[in-house]
Swiss-Prot record:
Involved in cytokinesis and septation where it has a role in the localization of F-actin. It comes from Mus musculus. Keywords: Cell cycle, Cell division, Coiled coil, Cytoplasm, Cytoskeleton, Septation. InterPro entries: AH/BAR_dom_sf, BAR_dom, BIN3/RVS161-like, Bin3_BAR. This is Bridging integrator 3. Residues 227-241 have a biased composition (Basic and acidic residues). The gene is Bin3. One of its GO terms (biological process) is cell division.
Length: 253
């Protein structure tokens, strides 16, 4: 004869309908997905702004290194070109810093604040689950006495069990109703909450790249040499490189 395990303290009577439990799991599942997506977006936005700042800071560092290059002491044209580049890179870095500050304030911080709500929500769900377990345990206790022979002591214990069950059942039903009412409202509020942030993100990017267009347009006008195409510059570089390789100090043994 095989032994069939059973759950201790579980009621035979279904205390929560499958429809209610299915609705609860669906709504909570949507919020769990929203929590994960919000945290991932916050993390990706932080990585993006950090990378943007690193890029513009590196560009300024390169232009500063070029300014300290000995070539600038000997060639005024080169000095003029590098000075123009350095000015452009500093302007780019300044606008980039403004963009990052704006995104931090209007996008990343709201994402962070929104994410901070989920621990309280998850705790409310845990309290609901604990209330459900208590409800099930006491319901099973009532059923146990209901199945016994109705003697005086049994009826007394049955009455006591029912009295213990009533507030626990009411507590679960209140928690369950509150979550079923408020979880869809919380999920639906995400659109109104995040729309201003995403609009601000788009505006910050548009302003930044509009300024970059102006900055690099000005730089192009300062650096362009009429009559020199990219192919001509490449040929000139190759010619000069060949001359350097022909020097005896760099010739192969």
């Amino acid at each position: 004869m095989s032994w069939i395990p059973f759950k201790i303290g579980q009621p035979k009577k279904q205390i929560v309908s499958k429809t209610v439990e299915r609705d609860f799991e669906r709504e909570y599942g949507k919020l769990q997905q929203l929590e994960e997506q919000t945290k991932r977006l916050q993390k990706d936005m932080k990585k993006s702004t950090d990378a943007d700042l690193a890029m513009s800071k590196s560009a300024v560092k390169i232009s500063q290194d070029l300014l300290s290059n000995p070539l600038c002491e000997q060639d005024q044209d080169f000095l003029h070109m590098v000075t123009a580049l350095d000015t452009a890179m500093k302007r780019m870095d300044a606008f980039n810093q403004e963009k990052v500050n704006q995104i931090q304030k209007t996008v990343i911080e709201p994402l962070k604040k929104f994410s901070s709500i989920f621990p309280s929500l998850n705790m409310a769900v845990k309290r609901r689950e604990q209330a459900l377990q208590d409800y099930g345990r006491l319901q099973a206790k009532v059923e146990k006495y209901e199945e016994k022979e109705k003697t005086g002591p049994v009826l007394a214990k049955l009455h006591q069990a029912r009295e213990e069950l009533r507030p626990v059942r009411e507590d679960f039903e209140a928690k369950n109703k509150q979550l079923l009412d408020e979880m869809p409202r919380f999920y639906g509020s995400r659109l109104d909450y995040f729309q201003p942030s995403f609009e601000s993100l788009i505006r910050a990017q548009v302003i930044y790249y509009s300024e970059m267009h102006k900055i690099f347009g000005d730089l192009t006008q300062q650096l362009d040499q009429p009559g020199h195409s990219d192919e001509q510059r490449e040929r000139e570089n190759e010619t000069k490189l060949s001359e350097l390789r022909a020097l005896s100090i760099v010739a192969d043994d």
